[in-house]
Amino acid sequence: MPFEIPFLVPILIVILLLVFFSLVPVGLWVTAQFSGVHVKISQLIGMRLRRVIPKNIINPLIKATKAGLNLTTNQLEAHYLAGGNVNTLVNALIAAQRADIELEFERAAAIDLAGRNVLEAVQVSVNPKVIETPNIAAVAMNGIEVIVKAKVTVRANIERLIGGAGEETIIARVGEGIVTTVGSSESHTSVLENPDSISKTVLNKGLDSGTAFEILSIDIADVDVGRNIGAKLQTDQAEADKRIAQAKAEERRAMAVAKEQEMIAEVRSMRAKVVESESKVPLAIAKALESGNLGVLDYYNMKNIISDTEMRQAISGNSEKIKEDDK
């Protein structure tokens, strides 16, 4: 029994040391102390327990302290737990200090948590950024298409980074201004001769209102002549009118054919009535003979007249046929 206790003491010491070094990054603590950042070991243990990686807080804090910024571990840890990028935040604060831009920690943290790249915003505030628009097609009043490509120089407005519109809005507004300016030009030649008029007109519209940027200049990079939209529209209209006329003509033809068929049916109906009436003639003659209204002599005289008429018709028909054959 007395031999077991001394044997367990070294094991317990080793276990305690392992637990201590797993909870406390001693190397990071030593680095912080020599860098002028006074961090307690209890603070590092608390970070471990809160599942915060100590180096993600201490290293940016060392950088900020060396740059002359007055930050605390609580500020950085709170920003880290909120989902922010501590390293980018500290770099942005250092860059703003060097560029003599007023940027407080709370403002920078809010910008970072809003999803903006606060470091890029500070850099664009110092060094303006050039946004290149895609090819923008606009049509002048004479119907000629003009294709314009512009370069917009912007500077970030840190005060409007939260809630301000981004680059897409700038590009859309510039494109709208170009289309409006070209559309109000009487001809495409005036646009080609003086492209600066586009940039001046668009720049005076205050397109950066409500955005996170301040437009410094709008430069026309390229101007090309596109299609003749006016002529194309006239051609399309003529083709449409032609198809409408053809459709109306086809409708009239169909109505004429239908009318012709109606007339043919009407003629056939009248012929049927004539045949029906002719079929009643012998019956009427028989009734007249039976009733005494028509004599036998009168009947034969009528037959002779009918035969004579048929003979004359046959003779006239043959003579007309002979004349046609002679021709």
From Swiss-Prot:
GO cellular component terms given for this protein: membrane raft; plasma membrane
General function of this protein: Found in functional membrane microdomains (FMM) that may be equivalent to eukaryotic membrane rafts. FMMs are highly dynamic and increase in number as cells age. Flotillins are thought to be important factors in membrane fluidity.
Gene behind the chain: floA
InterPro entries: FloA
Highest taxon, organism lineage: Bacteria
Mode of membrane association: Single-pass membrane protein
Keyword Transcription (UniProt): no
Transmembrane segments: 7-27
Assembly and oligomerization: Homooligomerizes.
Protein name: Flotillin-like protein FloA
UniProt xrefs under Pfam families: FloA
Keywords: Cell membrane, Membrane, Transmembrane, Transmembrane helix
Intrachain disulfide bonds: none
Compartments where located: Cell membrane; Membrane raft
Family: Belongs to the flotillin-like FloA family.
HAMAP family per UniProt: FloA
